[in-house]
Amino acid sequence: MHARMSVEIPQQDVMIVTGMSGAGRSTVGNALEDLGWYVVDNLPPQMLKPLVELAGRAGTSLPKIAAVVDVRGGDFFSELRDILHTFGTGPRLRVLFLEATDAALVRRFEQVRRPHPLQGNGTLLDGIAAERARMIEIREASDLVIDTSELNIHQLATTITEQFSGADDAGVRVTVMSFGFKYGTPADADMVADMRFLPNPFWTPELRPLTGRDKAVSDYVLGQEGAEEFVHAYARALAPVLAGYQRENKRHATIAIGCTGGKHRSVAVSEELSSLLRALPGVAVSTKHRDLGRE
């Protein structure tokens, strides 16, 4: 008898791309393909484990592998749970989940005039609700969640390029994102900080038309009592968190900084926090201002 072969961990990066129907899985697959990944679209969940095993074979010539999967082909979570139990999580095996609001998904399905794959004889919202309920455990098991509600296909492709190109040696990719609470808290945020404890430059006429990127606004915001103290204390508090992410092989983190409209305080603080986090070892930082220009 032949001895039973031991399980090999993936030798290439393997990413499982999933999420809500209409949230942009195909766009992400195309973007990864442009970055040199070998992309398998609409892979049946039952084929996930053989694909990961293939990536674990020494000498395989496949590049980085991405499998785009939805929930229609079987019990996805049981398959995913089996894979994570067998191979473990780590820098070579990741799960990317694409999220979007109900309103954004309804708008996209209506634009293409197609039914939701799970709506059956019900409404479009019924299908979305059914899928969202199925995906709760998968979302919680994901390494990275991207909310595509406010992104068009070009912006989503750019986001994927920023996240997955050219920094394989970075321990953690951190996105510092400013936002306005009146537009909703980012669904993909790992941590959220509220800047509404600071005076609002909106009520200063000469600052109102400017943004937190402008020096006058930045000086005003960071010059308020407690502002600089908060930013530096928050950066110090994040340092051991991000170091822990690296130890646990969590390669992405989104830190959301909010104010009322996402134009002044959150933008200024996000820029300052980003500059401090860039000094941390093993951390690659990008800064995004989700709601600039919405007013």
UniProtKB/Swiss-Prot annotation:
Q: Which UniProt keywords apply?
A: ATP-binding, GTP-binding, Nucleotide-binding
**Sequence positions that bind ATP:** G19, M20, S21, G22, A23, G24, R25, S26
> What's a single GO MF annotation on this record?
ATP binding
**Which residues are noted in the entry as GTP-binding?**
D70, V71, R72, G73
Looking up Pfam families in the UniProt record yields: PapZ_C, RapZ-like_N
Q: Which domain of life is it from?
A: Bacteria
UniProt xrefs under PANTHER family: RNASE ADAPTER PROTEIN RAPZ
Family note: Belongs to the RapZ-like family.
**Job of this protein:** Displays ATPase and GTPase activities.
| Protein name per the record | Nucleotide-binding protein CMS1991
